[in-house]
């Protein structure tokens, strides 16, 4: 039924497996030597984490840091860094995972190369919990941008 509906709008449709699991996010910061924040968890108040959960009222609970074991924290941080490096990312990104404790573990959902930066956004909250204040985060992002620009300028 959903596939039939999709084909009413286009001749192509992307089909993905539904994944049930916890939503875990890791902030990554850096150019050549990136580092990962403590992970956070989004606990939606509804079945899906939608626009209303994200932006209206108390739609979701943000757990920072996420309630994970030390080994789970290390694993998801290493996965976030591997994804960040594999995609040759610079500056910042937030890597989002589903955590299926029943067998498959951490599954990458997406990478956000321009993560939210509002007072309710996870990215600055993760760095705050990792010991980096909002102003320090901004300073570091500016330094990373200057370093990237200088490196590119010197290549030509």
Feature roles, as predicted:
Residues 1-4, 23-25:
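Glycine-rich phosphate-binding loop of ATP-grasp-fold ATP-dependent ligases
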Residues 34-58:
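Mobile, glycine-enriched helix-loop/loop "lid" segments at the mouths of ligand-binding/catalytic clefts
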Residues 10-20, 24:
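ATP-grasp fold ATP-binding core
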Residues 3-13, 55-101, 149, 153-155:
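A long amphipathic alpha-helix within ATP-dependent nucleotide-binding catalytic cores
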Residues 137-156:
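Cysteine/selenocysteine-centered motifs that mediate thiol-based redox chemistry or coordinate metal-sulfur cofactors
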């Amino acid at each position: 039924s959903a596939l039939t509906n999709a084909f009413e709008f286009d001749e192509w449709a992307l089909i993905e497996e539904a994944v049930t699991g916890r939503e875990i996010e890791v902030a990554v910061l850096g150019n050549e030597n990136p580092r990962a924040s403590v992970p956070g968890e989004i606990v939606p108040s509804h079945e899906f984490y939608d626009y209303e959960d994200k932006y209206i009222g108390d739609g979701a609970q943000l757990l920072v840091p996420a309630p994970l074991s030390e080994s789970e924290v290390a694993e998801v941080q290493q996965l976030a860094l591997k994804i960040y490096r594999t995609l040759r990312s610079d500056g910042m990104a937030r890597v989002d995972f589903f955590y299926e404790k029943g067998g498959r573990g951490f599954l990458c959902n997406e990478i956000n190369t321009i993560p939210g930066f509002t007072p309710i956004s996870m990215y600055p909250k993760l760095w705050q919990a990792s010991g980096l204040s909002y102003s320090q985060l901004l300073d570091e992002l500016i330094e990373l941008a200057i370093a990237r620009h200088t490196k590119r300028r010197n290549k030509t």
